[in-house]
């Protein structure tokens, strides 16, 4: 029976062979790892560029997306410095603005204050609630004439830009924008489609003229204009596709005429450290540009994480921050709102509780049926009106067979005998006794609910009142 022999020790030649092989292997590994090591060193050396690039992107996002929205509007809605009176509600095909409302008809305009001064006039209106917020390029509301602030008697206002030092004519109230670019997003209460005639007359009582035309008594100008037939990319998608160099170049140029607020001084210092200043686009080296680009993607991730992380909720509903429309140096909040709710009102004019979950914290989905129950004394506390709107995951209205996108206090809702109210939220048509209170959603699709409280009472703003939980029925 044979036996295995012990292995023969390697001789000197074998040892030299293995030594040379190890040297070659080590050299190959070092050469392979050297680029990674070099990248690590470069990342370390450019870490400030990366971090500041992220901060700068979050800081500048609202100004740039507002300008992108302005450019789109000039092609699809009408020229600058001319009011556009929206005469009907949006439908499910509307994608220009995230979470559009179907409670009001808009009167809007992008206004270039450098071509002013401008006179904005509102006729007396004691029939419908209205609010006319003027937003600067950074998405802060600097004036909001309307029912809450100026009453029902209307008003005449002189709109000017930064640095204007002229004399305000008698009879006009001064509104001075801190930026050259101004966006008016006026809203007039509309009680369903049968109310269009009344609201159209009220809209026609809102005018925008140059000061010279107003003083000479000329009518509101009407510029011949043909909307673009091209399918435009929505502003958020344009922002996603924009390179870091294009973004920061646009930001620098915009800041020349839309100056940052005085409180933004420390941020301007940071921008300067990565080669960005008002009116001065960046001229980066390849490595610096790559570093800032990485920072931009980190910023996208940061904001995306901010959007996804759990909010402080009451019965599943979260309420936008009290600084909405007046952000100060809360740049993260300002950027998040610009991404998901560009053009939001001041909380005193409207507040927007929203939810994506039911009472058990499970995501809302059209594969289930839900009930939203308001007790007899639990209806939204408002001085104007309230509604609840359903949106898909794309933040657009949900297509449905009855073209109903919201329910609210101006609808012919059916109340229970005790004065309570049930809203039925589901994809399939409910029984006939529930149809008037039915808010349709899409089968097997996730959705969210957005309440709107116009001219909310204090209880809705200080936390003494909150929306009821969404009850899953099956």
Stretch-by-stretch model annotation:
Residues 2-474:
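A compositional/structural signature for long, glycine/proline-rich flexible linkers
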């Amino acid at each position: 029976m044979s036996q295995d022999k012990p292995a023969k020790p390697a001789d000197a030649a074998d040892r030299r062979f293995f030594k040379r092989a190890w040297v070659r292997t080590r050299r190959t590994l070092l050469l392979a790892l050297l680029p990674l090591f070099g990248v690590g060193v470069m990342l370390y050396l450019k870490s400030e560029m990366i971090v500041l690039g992220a901060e700068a992107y979050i800081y500048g996002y609202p100004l740039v997306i507002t300008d992108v929205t302005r450019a789109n509007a000039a092609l699809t809605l009408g020229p600058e410095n001319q009011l556009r009176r929206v005469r009907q509600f949006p439908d499910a095909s509307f994608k220009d603005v995230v979470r559009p409302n179907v409670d009001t008809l808009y009167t809007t305009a992008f206004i270039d204050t450098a071509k002013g001064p401008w006179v904005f006039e509102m006729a007396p209106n004691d029939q419908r609630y209205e609010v006319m917020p003027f937003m600067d390029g950074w998405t802060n509301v600097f004036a909001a004439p309307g029912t809450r602030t100026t009453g029902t008697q209307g008003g005449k206002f002189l709109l000017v830009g930064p640095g204007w030092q002229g004399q305000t004519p008698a009879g006009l109230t001064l509104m001075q924008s801190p930026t050259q670019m101004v966006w008016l997003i006026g809203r007039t209460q509309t009680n369903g489609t049968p109310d269009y005639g009344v609201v159209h007359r009220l809209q026609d009582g809102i005018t925008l003229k140059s000061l010279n035309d107003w003083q000479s008594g000329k009518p509101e100008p009407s510029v011949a204009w043909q909307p673009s037939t091209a399918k435009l990319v929505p502003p958020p998608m344009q922002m996603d596709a924009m390179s870091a160099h294009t973004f920061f170049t646009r930001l620098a140029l915009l800041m020349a005429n839309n100056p940052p607020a005085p409180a933004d001084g420390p941020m301007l210092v940071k921008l300067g450290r990565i080669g960005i200043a008002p009116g001065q686009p960046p001229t980066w080296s390849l490595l610096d540009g790559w570093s800032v680009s990485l920072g931009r993607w980190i910023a996208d991730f940061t904001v995306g994480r901010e959007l996804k992380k759990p909010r402080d909720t009451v019965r599943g509903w979260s309420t936008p921050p009290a600084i909405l429309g007046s952000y100060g140096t809360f740049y993260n909040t300002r950027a998040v709102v610009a991404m998901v709710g560009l053009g939001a009102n001041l909380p005193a004019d409207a507040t927007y509780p929203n939810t994506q979950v039911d009472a058990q914290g499970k995501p809302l989905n059209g594969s289930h049926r839900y009930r939203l129950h308001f007790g007899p004394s639990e209806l939204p506390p408002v001085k104007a009106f309230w509604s609840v709107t359903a949106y898909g995951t794309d933040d657009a209205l949900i297509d449905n067979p009855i073209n109903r996108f919201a329910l609210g206090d101006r609808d012919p809702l059916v109340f229970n005998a005790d004065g309570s109210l049930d809203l039925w939220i589901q994809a399939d048509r409910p029984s006939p006794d529930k149809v008037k209170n039915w808010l349709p959603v899409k089968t097997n699709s996730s959705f969210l609910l957005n309440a709107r409280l116009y001219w909310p009472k204090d209880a809705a703003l200080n936390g003494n009142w909150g929306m009821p939980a969404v009850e899953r029925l099956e």
